C-alpha cells in the first residue's frame, strides 16, 4: 500500500489519517485524528512495506514498547499511546503529535547561544538519563541505549511552563541491555557522523556510547560544525575519524566557557572510560556551568565579608561569594584560562591521585596553582562544591606549612587536597610569599582516565589574615633551624587528622544558597 493510498483512511476504526508528514528508512509518519477522543491530533507511524519480515516487525513492536514505557517516565521522550496491525497486517503505532523544530533545523544557520544551549542540553540529558536507568521489560529491569542520538532526533516544541520543551525521538534502533544476554559482536547500526568508536566496532554498548554521540551533538549545537571530519564519508573514513582523529578545539569566537569546553571534550573521549560515566554527571556539570554564568560579579564588600562564627574560635573564617565555580575578575580570566587549557600533566609526575604546587607563568605574571589528579567523575562532581582552605605552620624540628584545600559537597562529602611547603627551600619560601601577596590560587584538575590536558579549573581565595601570616612565615623561616622534614610532615598530617571532623562539621552547616569559599585559620 502506497502512502497516497492511505490518505483519509480510518485506521482501526479510530484513527483518521489526514496527511503524510514524514518518512524514513523505517517507515512513514502521518498526522491523524483520534475519533474516539473527539478528533484530538495524533501521529501514526507505519513500518515500511519493504521491511515486512518477522525480525523487523519484532523490532518495530519493541520500539513502540520502549517508547511507551519511557514516555510514561519522562516528558522528554515522545509518548506512544497505541500499537496495532492494519488490515494488511502492517504494524503501526500511535504517538503524541508534536509541532516544533528539530535541532538540526534550529542550528542550520547559526549555533545556539550558551545560555539557550544549557537549557536544551539539560533536558536532553534528563530524557537520556531516564532511558539509561531503564524500564521493566518482560519482568526484567533493562537499561535502554538509544544508539542514534543526533540533532534530527531531538525536537523542540513550545511549552507554556518551560518555554522550550525537548523531546527525544526515534527509538527505532534502541538497545535493551539485558543481564542474561551474552556479550557478542553486533551488526553496525547508527548514523556514522555521531557513532561512538565502540558502536562502529559492533561491540556491546552501554550508556557511555550515547554520551559520545551526545558530545558530538553538543559540539555541533555550540558551533554549527562537526568536531571531526573524515577523509571521506565512507564507513572506513568515519571509523578512522572516530578512532584516531582529535576533535577540533573550540574557536575563541564562540566565547564558550572553559568548563563547558572541557565537558564536551570529555564526552568525546575515544575510550568509554575517559567519558563521564553517567548522564547524571553531565547534568551536575551543566548546573555548575549555569551557576557560573548567572551569578553576579563579586563586589569588594563580598570579598572581605567576615563570618567569625562559621568555624570555631581557633579557625576564624572568611566567606566569599563567588559568581560560580572558579571565576575571577574578567581582566584575568581569559588569559589564565587560555593558558590552563594548553597545560599538560608533567612527564615526571605519576599518573595517580596526587596534589602538588606549581607556579604558572601567565601574561599577568607568576601565579600560584595547585595541580590535582582525580577520577573524571569526581572532578565533575566537585565543580559545584564549597571551597575551603587553611594554612598550618610547624617550626620544629623543621619549618613547614601544611596547605589544606577541601572541596565539600553536601551529598558526596569532602575531598581533601593537602599539600606541604618546605620553608627551608627557596621554592617553598617563594610559594608562601606568592600566596600571601596574591591572596588567590588556581586549582587545575586532570582526569586519571584522560590525563593529557587540564580538564577543569577553579580559583580559591585566601583570607587576608592568612595572607599576612604566609608572608611573615616566608620571611622568618629563613633564620629558623632545619632538620628532619619528614618528622614535621608526619606531625602536620596528624594535626590535619585531628582537625578534619571539625572542618567537615562546620562546612556541613554552610547554606548551599550560592557557591562559597571558606578560608580559615
Curated annotation (Swiss-Prot):
The keyword Kinase applies. This is Serine/threonine-protein kinase A. GO terms for molecular function: ATP binding; protein serine kinase activity; protein serine/threonine kinase activity. It catalyses: L-seryl-[protein] + ATP = O-phospho-L-seryl-[protein] + ADP + H(+); L-threonyl-[protein] + ATP = O-phospho-L-threonyl-[protein] + ADP + H(+). It comes from Synechocystis sp. (strain ATCC 27184 / PCC 6803 / Kazusa). Autophosphorylated. It is an enzyme of class 2 (transferase). ATP binds at residues 21-29, 45. The active site is at 148 (proton acceptor). Gene3D superfamilies: Phosphorylase Kinase, domain 1, Transferase(Phosphotransferase) domain 1. Its EC number is 2.7.11.1.
Amino acid at each position: 500500500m502506497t502512502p497516497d493510498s492511505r490518505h483519509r483512511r480510518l485506521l482501526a476504526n479510530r484513527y483518521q489519517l489526514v496527511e503524510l508528514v514524514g518518512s524514513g528508512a523505517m517507515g512513514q509518519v502521518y498526522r491523524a485524528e483520534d475519533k474516539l477522543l473527539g478528533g484530538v491530533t495524533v501521529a501514526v507511524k507505519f513500518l515500511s512495506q519493504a521491511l515486512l519480515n518477522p525480525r523487523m516487525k519484532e523490532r518495530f513492536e519493541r520500539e513502540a514498547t520502549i517508547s511507551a514505557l519511557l514516555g510514561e517516565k519522562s516528558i522528554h521522550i515522545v509518548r506512544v499511546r497505541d500499537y496495532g496491525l492494519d488490515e494488511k497486517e502492517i504494524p503501526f503505532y500511535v504517538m503524541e503529535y508534536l509541532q516544533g523544530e528539530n535541532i538540526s533545523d534550529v542550528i542550520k544557520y547559526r549555533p545556539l547561544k550558551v545560555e539557550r544551549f544549557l537549557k536544551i542540553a539539560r533536558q536532553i540529558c534528563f530524557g537520556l538519563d531516564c532511558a539509561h536507568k531503564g524500564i521493566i521489560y518482560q519482568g526484567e529491569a533493562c537499561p535502554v541505549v538509544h544508539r542514534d542520538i543526533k540533532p534530527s532526533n531531538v525536537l523542540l516544541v513550545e511549552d507554556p511552563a518551560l518555554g522550550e520543551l525537548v523531546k527525544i525521538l526515534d527509538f527505532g534502533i534502541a538497545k535493551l541491555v539485558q543481564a542474561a544476554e551474552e556479550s557478542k559482536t553486533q551488526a553496525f547500526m547508527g548514523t556514522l557522523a555521531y557513532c561512538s568508536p565502540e558502536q562502529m566496532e559492533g561491540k556491546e554498548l552501554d550508556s557511555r556510547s550515547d554520551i559520545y554521540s551526545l558530545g558530538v551533538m553538543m559540539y555541533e549545537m555550540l558551533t554549527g560544525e562537526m568536531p571531526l571530519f573524515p577523509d571521506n564519508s565512507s564507513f572506513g573514513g568515519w571509523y578512522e575519524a572516530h578512532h584516531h582523529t582529535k576533535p577540533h578545539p573550540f574557536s575563541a569566537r564562540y566565547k564558550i566557557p572553559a568548563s563547558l569546553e572541557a565537558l564536551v571534550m570529555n564526552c568525546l573521549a575515544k575510550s568509554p572510560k575517559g567519558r563521564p560515566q553517567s548522564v547524571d554527571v553531565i547534568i551536575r556539570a551543566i548546573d555548575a556551568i549555569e551557576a557560573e554564568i548567572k551569578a553576579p560579579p563579586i563586589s569588594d564588600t563580598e570579598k572581605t565579608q567576615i563570618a567569625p562564627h562559621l568555624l570555631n574560635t581557633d579557625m576564624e573564617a572568611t566567606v566569599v561569594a563567588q559568581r560560580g565555580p572558579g571565576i575571577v575578575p574578567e581582566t584575568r580570566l581569559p588569559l589564565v584560562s587560555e593558558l590552563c587549557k594548553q597545560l599538560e600533566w608533567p612527564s615526571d609526575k605519576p599518573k595517580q591521585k596526587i596534589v602538588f604546587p606549581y607556579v604558572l607563568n601567565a601574561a599577568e605574571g607568576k601565579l600560584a596553582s595547585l595541580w590535582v589528579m582525580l577520577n573524571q567523575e569526581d572532578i565533575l562532581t566537585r565543580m559545584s562544591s564549597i571551597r575551603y582552605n587553611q594554612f598550618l605552620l610547624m617550626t620544629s624540628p623543621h619549618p613547614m606549612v601544611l596547605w589544606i584545600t577541601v572541596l565539600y559537597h553536601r551529598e558526596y562529602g569532602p575531598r581533601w587536597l593537602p599539600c606541604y611547603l618546605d620553608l627551608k627551600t627557596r621554592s617553598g619560601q617563594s610559594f608562601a610569599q606568592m600566596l600571601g601577596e596574591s591572596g588567590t590560587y588556581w586549582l587545575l584538575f586532570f582526569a586519571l582516565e584522560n590525563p593529557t590536558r587540564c580538564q577543569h579549573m577553579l580559583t580559591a581565595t585566601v583570607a587576608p589574615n592568612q595572607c599576612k601570616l604566609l608572608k611573615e612565615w616566608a620571611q622568618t623561616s629563613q633564620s629558623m633551624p632545619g632538620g628532619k622534614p619528614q618528622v614535621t610532615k608526619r606531625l602536620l598530617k596528624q594535626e590535619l587528622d585531628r582537625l578534619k571532623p571539625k572542618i567537615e562539621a562546620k562546612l556541613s552547616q554552610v547554606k548551599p544558597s550560592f557557591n562559597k569559599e571558606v578560608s580559615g585559620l
